[in-house]
Amino acid sequence: MNKIVIQNPRIINEGRSFIGSVLVEGDKIAAVFEGEVPGNVRAEANQVIDATGKWLIPGVIDDQVHFRDPGLTHKGDIGTESRAAVAGGVTPFMDMPNTKPQTTTIADLEWKFNRAAEVSRANYSFFFGGTNDNMDEIRRLDRSRVPGLKLFLCSSSGNMLVDKKDSLERIFGEAGMLIAIHAEKEEVIRRNIQYYTNLHGEDLDISFHSKIRSEEACYQCSAEAVELATRLDSRLHILHLSTEKELSLLSNHLPLSEKKITGEVCVHHLWFHDGDYAQFGNRIKWNPSIKTIEDRAALREAVNNNTIDIVATDHAPHLPEEKQGSCLKAASGGPLIQHSLITMLELAMEGRFTYEKVVEKMAHMPAELFRIDRRGYIRPGYYADIVLIDPEQTWTVSKENILYKCGWSPFEGYTFHHGVWKTFVNGELAYGDGEVNDAVRGKEVRYL
């Protein structure tokens, strides 16, 4: 069995930060030491990595990605985007069902598992898509293999709108598993489109996006979902929260293990605000839209006070030409997974979060919320999903170092002040010194 000692990094884990060492045996963490690793342990290792001056954290768990496989692979695929993931310190991902075909049958879910086993450099998992008429398929799901159901409560990329009241009642009442939602009120969006096109015509610029996909569209839909989940005693997870108003629907009075209603925020809503549309244009067009600087401040505070439980990406690559055109025509979404951890570390450097909070929201809490088997922490017996950070690396995002298949990033030209030095996936070096190890394959994530 391969034995690796990672010696003398600063370990950031479970709210603590200390100089220590980690012993990896095979695909698991065998021991965690404070201070120097014992000499006999070091002597028995096949490899000793001197990580002095580096930081060691558990691999990031991203609960919302769109890797575009199958059917949309001109934008990205499981192979290419998992390469970007490990380069960004993401070791397990949860992929969304709005592909072609949509992941709304057991057969299509199995196709994704088989494809990921062949090509994914990171550990993999897939949400199952709920529709107006696939309750029989939902009942057949193996709950240990999927993180939950994904419902689109508005028309967004992929057109998987679930809009029949009886279908929603049945899913929330009978699914017996976590339900993750994209919450924007379809009627409000359509009304806003009608209003602004009547005033300004069809060729609306990007500044109208946050007016069309407005605060009220988000709040109304989230509030209705919370009411339904509360009434039917369901587990509800609201994805990509974008407004201060929605935060009133969530609570930080209970530990995560007791929460039935939880929330996620994405890095772009913590980084950008609507004043950035003038500079970045359609590159920062997402659904839900980027909102005000006040919303951004409230979302940051909600991460710090635990009203928001998870930070993720909604990684959704499109080709540059698909991002062109008016507000109503340009594709929504963008590639983020290679830069999500680094972005959060940059915000921590600015004093917005502690580094311990970044690790909590990107690794620990996803593992807890989704009840993932032995991932998300630096603990003996857990899978050795480990990221080593260089806290002194200064580098600029450019086309030369972007790994997304789509070839661009909203962070192009930005200089970051931390870098991912090495990423281990199940004890194997998946990324190191700027190179992806394409021989590594991730494992299927399991749920308890």
Language-model segments: what does each one mean?
Residues 1-5, 10-58:
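Histidine-rich, glycine-flanked metal-binding segment
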Residues 9, 22, 27, 53, ...:
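Divalent metal-coordination and catalytic microenvironments
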Residues 51-119:
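Metal-associated gating/positioning segment near the N- to mid-region
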Residues 95, 125-128, 235-240:
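Short catalytic-loop micro-motif centered on adjacent basic/acidic residues
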